[in-house]
């Protein structure tokens, strides 16, 4: 036996490493059907198992990051379809498969049907965003299409009761698994549309295997959802479960509870928002009222300086002065006339002309009459002018307003009360009428709606 001149010599570890790279790079991803045996789950959370058929077997490993996405419980003896890459466990030189996904064997056929229907409906535009309907911001009534005995219904009702206990709910019970479930779901959606009593629908169920959820991948359900006039939220299984119904629905919720969150208002949050807005409104109103109060006080000060009563008092005083001056003038004139009469009488008495005296007496009487008439007319005119001035002033006088049945109410400090917010229970207030004042105690204060 002869050796080549330059043979390539491997160590065992080097050989295993190159074989591993060769398997991983050349073979790539493979799909494999087989029966589970020797399944073990150590504390690390990884799965170690053997896949076999009637003639051969292969060791497999499925690490924790991948096996947490498996939605069924693997068991020895169960037929499965796995997606894996070939590798080699170098320390022992064991050829093995690193499994990336696993599903029951029948799920492979179902997955193929799923992909074909998905492509067909997508080509028709049933998944397009332009075909989606907007969800109402504040639904008036929510319809739930699911099993009447399933956990999904309990979860949805629990969330709706917590967030918006007054929201009306209509339940359209239906099968959500097994033969005939797809037809019942489509009929329930059609019934909800024909009754037109809800403005949003939740269609869904809890988690399960691909076979359990298959009714939501049926074409009849997809087309019924697409044709619905009422917006539909799909809520099928868990977040990792994706169905044809999710693509066709107007909105997809990862879980039934999440769907209930989507379609309901958070009443407590809204109440907090209303309370915040109320506080802001009250603060703004207080600032506005404070500003108006300052403006009112300034106006009141200006009005008091120009009050009609003050003007009336000034005019009345002026009229009194004019009247006094008039009376003095008349008195002086009378005195002068009286003096003249006395002087003429003296002269007449000295001259003793009877006829002249008689004539002068008549003339004097005439002058006296005319003077008195003039005085009466002048006095009447002055009184008339005084009455007109008083009448004009009376039209703007607060006393005239009081005479018409109005009143003015002051607090204990003498400030005018214009609002029920300016008084407290037990305050003493004074109300002025045209003929006097009334003092009273506040026992009730209410605002007009």
Curated annotation (Swiss-Prot):
Q: Which Pfam families match?
A: Exonuc_VII_L (PF02601), tRNA_anti_2 (PF13742)
Specify the superkingdom: Bacteria
One Gene Ontology term of the molecular function aspect: nucleic acid binding
Stored CDD domains: ExoVII_LU_OBF (cd04489)
Q: Where in the cell is it found?
A: Cytoplasm
Summarizing the function annotation, the protein's role is: Bidirectionally degrades single-stranded DNA into large acid-insoluble oligonucleotides, which are then degraded further into small acid-soluble oligonucleotides.
The family assignment reads: Belongs to the XseA family.
- Subunit structure as annotated in this protein's UniProt entry: Heterooligomer composed of large and small subunits.
- Protein name as it appears in the record: Exodeoxyribonuclease 7 large subunit
